[in-house]
């Protein structure tokens, strides 16, 4: 890690998580083990790299990451990679899984929740009512499901203290959306957060169906998708907050539409 957003190394780590995500899905769809091997090899390489990393050297953020200049990007990396790991889990030996989890996923999840050394700003972010916290809780919860770590899942759902009173994914669903599904940070960030909201909810539905997560708060996630689409003109989202140019073709929205259509065709 040497650069910030847009830098060569930063973009390579982004390309890596996209590649792992898509290869994991490709393995599930085709059964071709070359896709699983690609993911497994890359995870083993990251498991060697990650323990050697301190805070990112750029020091541009009060919540610096290790692979990336800010922890937010670390959370995004883990959301994608958790899917890839789950998709190829049974192709790895128990020894491979133990090494990857011990050296990569456990320390990364712990870092996202609590930081390290003298900097524990990540704990505040993890429990915040903010899009960064949505990515963080989704990342920790999804890798928790993949590793069968109930403690991680509980913290992701109900905050660091496990009560749901300070933070967590459920509290975010209560506080970040109006009853109609409008997001407190505007359309641009609603677009950014919709995928971790929906894909983590899909995991919760699969693993903890009694929570009935897609029905929670009168189906607030479906309402959020509907309002997000309405917050556009000629295919482009309204420029509220510090918005950049994004529209209905954004990959986060495409994934969210697919998942929620499957929930309620």
Where are the predicted features?
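Low-complexity, Ser/Thr/Pro/Gly-enriched N-terminal "stalk/linker" regions
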Residues: 1-2
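Aromatic-lined, polymer-binding surfaces characteristic
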Residues: 9-225
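C-terminal, helix-dominated tail/subdomain
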Residues: 209-265
